[in-house]
Design a protein with these regions (language model features):
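A low-complexity, Ser/Thr/Gly/Pro-enriched, surface-exposed linker/loop concept
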Residues: 42-92, 125-133
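Bacterial N-terminal signal peptides
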Residues: 6-15
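Cleaved targeting-peptide boundary
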Residues: 21-28
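Histidine (H) residue identity feature
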Residues: 27, 74, 120-121
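N-terminal signal peptide c-region/cleavage motif recognized by signal peptidases
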Residues: 17-19
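Extracellular/lumenal glycan-associated surfaces
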Residues: 30-48, 68, 99-117
Length: 133
């Protein structure tokens, strides 16, 4: 009986989890920019090679500083302070977008652009520049 109950709970949990709420990982066709969208929390992209210089690392950042940008539920895009790295997923072809929850990211030859569709805040990230709005 316990195993039947456990199976029922697992199946119910899987049925309740919709693809729209799951995190989705993807990267630019060049693989220089790697991103994740967590539907209710944030869109974040990390970059491997860049020609721009980030602002000075704040004393409040204990992790790696400005290896990418992110936009959350509120406020404009910001530089990342993290202890992990985004990796995995499939290439998002140039000219295509991916959406999860309130976030949309668009892959362009000029870089990746991610926006919170409700607040219209976000960021643009490329080898040449990092822009927050």
């Amino acid at each position: 009986m316990r195993s039947l109950l456990a199976v029922t709970v697992v199946v119910a949990a899987l049925a309740a989890a919709s693809p729209a709420s799951a995190a989705v990982f993807f990267h630019s066709p060049s693989n220089n920019i790697r991103c994740v969208i967590q539907a209710t929390q944030l869109a974040r992209c990390d970059i491997t090679e860049r020609d721009w210089t980030p602002p000075p690392k704040p004393a409040s950042c204990p992790g790696d500083w400005a290896n990418g940008l992110q936009v959350g539920r509120h406020g404009r895009g910001r530089f990342t302070c993290v202890t992990d790295a985004v990796d995995g997923g499939k290439a998002l072809p140039y000219g295509e977008s991916i959406e999860r929850g309130r976030f949309r990211c668009t892959s362009r030859r000029a870089g990746m652009r991610c926006v919170n569709k409700r607040t219209h805040h976000g960021f643009g990230l490329s080898r040449q520049r990092a822009r927050r709005f």
